Amino acid sequence: AIDCKTVDAALVPCVPYLTGGGTPTTQCCSGVSSIKTMAGTPQDKKDACNCVKAAANRYPNIRDDVAQALPVKCNVQLDIPVSRTTNCDAI
């Protein structure tokens, strides 16, 4: 099962990137990679998606364009959008 605290901890190093752009740190990309590893099943993906969405909603300064580019910038094939508006049931 996915624990949102774990997802939050994975994303915390990404906050400066998500709010300011630039290049994500190694710690941030490691976190993105760990979320991908956690989300092994379709249900885990939905749960992780809801955690990511909730985390994104706690930071109103997150730039959606930057957030959506995060997996690409980290070279991680993440099937979970980093967004405040994702419909996680559609994943």
From Swiss-Prot:
Say which domain of life the source belongs to: Eukaryota
- List the cysteine pairs that form cystine: C4-C51, C14-C28, C29-C74, C49-C88
A single BP term in Gene Ontology: lipid transport
**PROSITE patterns, alphabetically?**
PLANT_LTP
Q: Which UniProt keywords apply?
A: Disulfide bond, Lipid-binding, Transport
Q: Which GO terms describe its molecular function?
A: lipid binding
Show the SMART domains listed in the entry: AAI (SM00499)
**What does UniProt note about where in the body, tissue by tissue, this protein is expressed?**
Expressed in seeds (at protein level).
> InterPro entries from the entry?
Bifun_inhib/LTP/seed_sf, Bifunc_inhib/LTP/seed_store, Plant_nsLTP
Tell me which family the UniProt entry assigns to this protein: Belongs to the plant LTP family.
What biological function has been recorded for the protein in this entry? Plant non-specific lipid-transfer proteins transfer phospholipids as well as galactolipids across membranes. May play a role in wax or cutin deposition in the cell walls of expanding epidermal cells and certain secretory tissues. Binds to both saturated and unsaturated lipids, with the highest binding efficiency for linoleic acid, followed by linolenic acid.
Name used for this protein in its record: Non-specific lipid-transfer protein 1
Q: Which species does the entry assign this protein to?
A: Foeniculum vulgare
Phylogenetic classification of the source organism: Eukaryota, Viridiplantae, Streptophyta, Embryophyta, Tracheophyta
